[in-house]
Amino acid sequence: MNNGRIVRINGPLVVADNMKNAQMYEVVEVGEPRLIGEITRIEGDRAFIQVYEDTSGIKPNEPVYRTGAPLSIELGPGLIGKIFDGLQRPLDSIKELTKSPFIARGIKVPSVDRKTKWHFIPKVKKGDKIEGGDIIGIVNETPLVEHRILVPPYVHGTLKEIVAEGDYTVEDPIAVVDMNGDEVPIRLMQRWPVRIPRPFREKLEPTEPLLTGTRVLDTIFPIAKGGTAAIPGPFGSGKTVTLQSLAKWSAAKIVIYVGCGERGNEMTDELRQFPSLKDPWTGRPLLERTILVANTSNMPVAAREASIYVGITMAEYFRDQGYDTLLVADSTSRWAEALRDLGGRMEEMPAEEGFPSYLPSRLAEYYERAGRVKTVGKPERFGSVTVASAVSPPGGDFTEPVTSQTLRFVKVFWPLDVSLAQARHYPAINWLQGFSAYVDLVANWWNTNVDPKWREMRDMMVRTLIREDELRQIVRLVGPESLAEKDKLVLETARLIKEAFLKQNAYDDIDAFSSPQKQARVMRLIYLFNTHASRLVERGIPTKKIVDSMGQLLPEIIRSKAAIKNDELNKYDELERKLISVFENLEKEAGT
């Protein structure tokens, strides 16, 4: 394979000639330090290479070494609990090797530890017919994750050999497949190109909600397992904290957190918190189900794109094992800015605000890899990849290209409002601008498993919030006294919804995570208040009298979110009894 020669260097873009027969997206090693790069354009025998490491110090005429392979990652036991850079190099291994807090250029470190032995339990026997995606055995990687060893998608045939139960490294052959006369070894580890989606048998409709423990996300704008969501918001509106809450408390089996071009201290927060936090679904440390990809703002710009693809490829791998995975990306705007930077250096025709014209297709490729699927292989299983991405529009302008294009491809929109954040209303998700296309799909699950009136109660809350916004303009002009009594009740109910339900403290031990049952109990109290109070208002009782009769009951309902634990829901029975008792007394008064 002929090596190329550098002719031009422009930041992360390197142009090399003598690259005849090179392939698009082929990985090359650039210059004497052998920096990792990827071919993004070919003109004759000249290749344009985006380099994923700092190019300072390399010179024209230095060699470019071809590998003949696309950018691929290693998939196997040893991924869980690790933190990787944007090229899937484990940061702890780099630190041990270099004895430095910085990543040395051109360093080569295996993504999956070659020395660790894993206890392999075979699930197939010699002579079995196997195909791509079949589970041939398991490795208990962590107490939370049973790592299912899959036949690579392109392998099929008769199982000629399979090892006995025992301890093996990721490079040891554990099986041999007779594939049309060729003997193909299977190891615990496999490689997969990051830009190619992993195959599946069938894409399914997402009908089960991905529970997050955040009330506004679960109830007002729910996301389904296999769904796509965007969280746009200006600086300081709470994007990172919202995404961290998602990563901490979501009911996903595997969480992959990609820090793409954001500040390094945010990744540090994750690493400090996750080992000490317990998964509310299993009681185990959160790091036992989490993979972190750190491609922070001070790392090379070009590697931001790689980090996004690395994250979603790992998510697809665990999906193929039959797991529900969540990919959290913070933030896709930084990736888009990297595309803009590289597009400018390659002298491409810019589109709106300087972003490349292919930005929508790149975003579409990324979001289309989400979904709930029936996987290939035996036994039959179902898995999902849910994608939640932050978008960082400058100045909170949602009409800028990255936000507006993202809106075309996502089904859930969680817009963060800086005015809510300034008013200390967190999560600062604007209930008027947001939307979810999954409400109808997940309503049946909520009605069946949590509360048969869930949809009715949710719709009442949404209607009340919309009506309150309409009334706010009138209140500003003439004051609340001029409103009809039923409209005064709308304002009171909306206040209760916001204070008791929508506001949530991500740093409170009790309030940080609300179980579906607890959410339904709080909704039920608000629903009862609104229903009974509406009847009394129709009978001529003023809203002020109803609120005054409540005494300390409404503040008690508001405080309950941080006072009543998820396993103490019987305490809501007492609040319900008190609420109904107040209304019964008011109805007796109204009847006389």
Swiss-Prot record:
GO cellular component: plasma membrane; proton-transporting two-sector ATPase complex, catalytic domain
EC number: 7.1.2.2
Subcellular location: Cell membrane
EC primary class: translocase
Keyword Magnesium carried by entry: no
SUPFAM superfamilies in alphabetical order: C-terminal domain of alpha and beta subunits of F1 ATP synthase (SSF47917), N-terminal domain of alpha and beta subunits of F1 ATP synthase (SSF50615), P-loop containing nucleoside triphosphate hydrolases (SSF52540)
InterPro entries: AAA+_ATPase, ATP-synt_VA_C, ATP-synth_a_Xtn, ATP_synth_asu-like_sf, ATP_synth_asu_arc, ATPase_F1/V1/A1_a/bsu_N, ATPase_F1/V1/A1_a/bsu_N_sf, ATPase_F1/V1/A1_a/bsu_nucl-bd
GO biological process annotation, one example: proton motive force-driven plasma membrane ATP synthesis
Main localization category: membrane
Superkingdom of this protein's organism: Archaea
Known catalytic reactions: ATP + H2O + 4 H(+)(in) = ADP + phosphate + 5 H(+)(out)
Binding-site positions, ATP: 233-240
Keyword Cell membrane set for record: yes
UniProt keyword list: ATP synthesis, ATP-binding, Cell membrane, Hydrogen ion transport, Ion transport, Membrane, Nucleotide-binding, Translocase, Transport
Membrane topology note: Peripheral membrane protein
GO molecular function: ATP binding; ATP hydrolysis activity; proton-transporting ATP synthase activity, rotational mechanism; proton-transporting ATPase activity, rotational mechanism
Quaternary structure and partners: Has multiple subunits with at least A(3), B(3), C, D, E, F, H, I and proteolipid K(x).
Entry function: Component of the A-type ATP synthase that produces ATP from ADP in the presence of a proton gradient across the membrane. The A chain is the catalytic subunit.
Family: Belongs to the ATPase alpha/beta chains family.
Name by which UniProt lists this protein: A-type ATP synthase subunit A
Organism: Saccharolobus islandicus (strain Y.N.15.51 / Yellowstone #2) (Sulfolobus islandicus)
Phylogenetic classification of the source organism: Archaea, Thermoproteota, Thermoprotei, Sulfolobales, Sulfolobaceae
Gene that this polypeptide is encoded by: atpA
